[in-house]
Amino acid sequence: MVDELKPVPPSKRWGQMPRHYHPDDAPWISAKLGTLDPSLRAEVCAAYTKAYLEVWEAEPLSYRKHGKARFSANTRLRVFIGKRFAVFNR
């Protein structure tokens, strides 16, 4: 199943990006990752890819794979960024 999901080639990535993500999410992911220190970006990219692949592999219906994987990985990233910068929003 994962064989069908090809990683986004480095030449098509926006700077330091996760290995797997939906191309339509690239500007949003790039903007969120841009708020992080460079030392933390690689770790967050790996976590995003892991979240994306976990849901991709678990979803039995092929037409739902990208949608569910996007939702899960993007939600995790949004919550992480929100918690990380919550102290500045008070």
Name each region found by the language model.
Residues 2-90:
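C-terminal alpha-helical interaction appendages
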